[in-house]
Amino acid sequence: MAPLSSMMNSLQGPLSQEGKLQERKSDKEDAQSNDKAAVKGCKGKALSLPFSVESLISDRTSSRTLYTSSEAGIISPTSGADERLKLSPMALYADRKIPVESVSNLSDCKRGDMEELSDKGQSGWFQTTSYTSPPRHSSPPPCTLRKHKNNRKPRTPFTTSQLLALERKFRQKQYLSIAERAEFSNSLNLTETQVKIWFQNRRAKAKRLQEAELEKLKLATKPLLPAFAFPFPLGTHVGSPPLYGPSSSFPRPALPVPGLFGGPVTYGMYYLS
């Protein structure tokens, strides 16, 4: 008997393990079928709502078929009003008679989806975005002024006596020869280059002054209005009939005024210099 009982126990051990595995598989299949049924129920509820995308599309297709059928014949106003009442959201809601529980369940499903999307969006925002300061443009370099050469000699001002002597010599002769310039520079204790440059500057100044004087003379001689003259001298009879009184065929002698007008008079206006 003892060996038979041990044999039975050894056979019952693997059988019990196989039964447990089958029970676990059946439990998993039941859970998956329940999840699929819940998802299908949510989708069916979403499809049954009057304001869902599918219901709106179906309403549009029905209204289009009505319009196409109305093009074939004339629809009476009463029938059009009836169709509008039938297609109104309130009528659709009353016809379908959607229970309140399905609406609440669908709203819960939509809220859960919106929360998941918002959580994903916030996590992506915090992960991807990072504040970076805009790059600053470097300030432009300061304007560098032109510097004089280092080997340039300092400017030495002329004395009053030297200026008077140079001006007197310039009035006598504007261009000096090499010998005259050497002798004149030695007499004033100046270099030939200084005398040469002074004469060049003085000639340029004299040219500018001369051009300014010529411009003034042009403005002074230019009249403001063009001069005009009478076509006949004053004091002569033109032969026009008198304005008042009877006309006579004899010419009326003019009385000349001695010393007043001897010829044609011209008038002109000029600028005052």
UniProtKB/Swiss-Prot annotation:
InterPro entries referenced in this protein's UniProt entry, alphabetically: HD (IPR001356), HD_metazoa (IPR020479), Homeobox_CS (IPR017970), Homeodomain-like_sf (IPR009057), Msh_Homeobox_Regulators (IPR050674)
MF (Gene Ontology): DNA-binding transcription factor activity, RNA polymerase II-specific; RNA polymerase II transcription regulatory region sequence-specific DNA binding
Chain intervals with Basic residues compositional bias: 145-155
Comp. bias regions, Basic and acidic residues: 20-33
Cysteines engaged in disulfide bonds, as pairs: none
Chain residues forming the annotated DNA-binding region: 151-210
GO cellular component, one term: nucleus
Disordered: annotated segments: 1-41, 114-159
Keyword terms, alphabetized: Developmental protein, DNA-binding, Homeobox, Nucleus
Composition-biased stretches (Polar residues): 1-15, 120-136
Subcellular location: Nucleus
One family name in Pfam for this protein: Homeodomain
Chief location of this protein within or outside the cell: nucleus
GO biological-process terms attached to the record: embryonic morphogenesis; otic placode formation; regulation of transcription by RNA polymerase II
Purpose: Involved in the development of the inner ear.
Record family assignment: Belongs to the Msh homeobox family.
Name of this chain's protein: Homeobox protein MSH-C
Species: Danio rerio
Name of the encoding gene: msxc
